[in-house]
A protein has these predicted regions:
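Short, conserved catalytic-motif segment at the N-terminal edge
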Residues: 4-61, 84, 315
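Short loop/turn microsegments at loop-to-beta-strand junctions
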Residues: 25-27, 290-293
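Active-site SXXK
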Residues: 15-16, 35, 60-88, 162-167, ...
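Short, well-ordered beta-strand elements
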Residues: 39-41, 294, 301-310, 314
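Short, glycine/proline-biased beta-turn/loop segments that scaffold the active-site neighborhood
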Residues: 86-103, 181
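Hydrophobic (often cysteine-bearing) scaffold residues that line and stabilize catalytic clefts
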Residues: 7-11, 63, 67, 72, ...
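Short, gly/Ser/Thr-rich active-site loops of penicillin-recognizing serine hydrolases
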Residues: 242, 250, 255-260, 271-273, ...
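Short, surface-exposed loop or secondary-structure junction motifs
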Residues: 40, 47, 102-283
Length: 339
């Protein structure tokens, strides 16, 4: 096996090219092993418009849907281990006002496990922010909405509901939940990578959540709102590989196929997935719309995060982000070959 520094240089070549060709403003790649070895490389800009700002290792990235795993799934597993909830509890056990005017509604029978593994009838996304910016009114709407039924899909709505459940069980707003160093809901804008010029908000987004629904829900929701530095994300990955974060049964839930290509919260390696070719069978990963991603290969004992601001200054560009993610993961698998 090559050294960590050699491995990351090889892995970073496609990212450097993406920056040089102007497809992505800035990118940070971080590697960490189960033994605690770590290496980080950065290239490009934290902001391209309205002025250029170089990207540094300490910059905050809007993690987007990495919130679902690093924050929401993590907190739910903790509640399970504390005996405060069970994975097969219906949401209505902890959110009694969920569809309270129709006791036979399908939403009242949805379980925590189904939402975590995206096995519900709920839609992928809904433009909730168009209904207003009062968080409590939006939460009430979400809970009483008669959602159109469809086949299971990867759904923000699943995790918005799980975020509400966490608040109900703990009695604490999501925004007040304690976070580890390197993770925050309120980053310094001056130290944050810019995302998109938001026509709805009328400004370039930097240091505030990019996701419109999370913004309208107060800045934090179960599906988005978390920011992290590369080291904050790597610290989280290392804690999972080190087996000290959760019990063995909980770790098995996170790394064992639940339905489709999903474990609880995470996606697991499968042919054609975003983590590239050559991942071990117990590799889990997740993506964020802003251009972020985290992958953890439990068998090899290595994790990597690719953090970009590919939506800056607009999401409507050909960034090639999915191909970049796959190529980066494929190069890692080649560098960390298993015997």
């Amino acid at each position: 096996m090559t050294s960590l520094s050699e491995s990351i240089e090889t892995m970073f070549e496609p990212a450097r090219l993406a920056v040089a060709e102007g497809r992505i403003p800035g990118v940070t790649l971080g590697l960490v092993t189960a033994k605690g070895e770590r290496s980080v490389l950065t290239a490009g800009l934290a902001q391209r418009e309205p002025e250029s700002i170089p990207l540094h290792r300490a910059h905050w990235f809007d993690l987007a849907s990495l919130t679902k795993v690093i924050f929401t799934t993590d907190n739910l597993i903790r509640l399970v281990e504390q005996g405060r909830v069970a994975l097969d509890d219906p949401l209505s056990l902890h959110i009694p006002d969920l569809r309270q005017y129709e006791t036979g509604a399908a939403e009242r029978r949805l379980t925590i496990r189904q939402c975590l593994s995206h096995q519900t009838h709920l839609p992928a996304v809904e433009p909730l922010y168009t209904l207003g910016q009062d968080p409590e009114t939006l939460r009430a709407y979400i809970l009483q909405r008669n959602w159109k039924s469809g086949p299971p899909v990867y759904s923000d709505i699943n995790f918005i509901l799980l975020g509400i459940l966490i608040e109900r069980v703990t009695g604490t707003p999501l925004s007040a939940v304690d976070l580890s160093p390197g993770l925050t809901f309120r980053p310094d804008p001056a130290s944050s990578a810019a995302t998109e010029f938001c026509a709805w908000r009328g400004r370039m987004i930097r240091g505030e959540v990019h996701d419109e629904n999370a913004f309208a829900l107060g800045g934090v929701a179960g599906h988005a709102g978390l920011f992290g530095t590369v080291d904050g994300v790597l610290d989280y990955a290392a804690s999972l590989m080190g087996r000290q974060r959760f019990s063995a049964p909980s770790m098995a839930d996170l790394t064992t196929l639940s339905a489709g290509t999903r474990t609880l919260g995470w996606e697991i390696a499968h042919p054609g997935w975003h983590g590239g070719e050559g991942s071990s069978a117990r590799t889990i990963g997740h993506l964020g719309f802003t251009g972020t991603g985290l992958w953890i290969d439990m068998d090899r004992g290595v994790a990597w995060t690719l953090l970009t601001n590919r939506v800056h200054p607009s999401r409507h560009s050909e960034s090639g982000i999915m191909a970049l993610r796959r190529e980066t993961g494929t190069r890692l698998a080649a560098a960390f070959k298993q015997d």
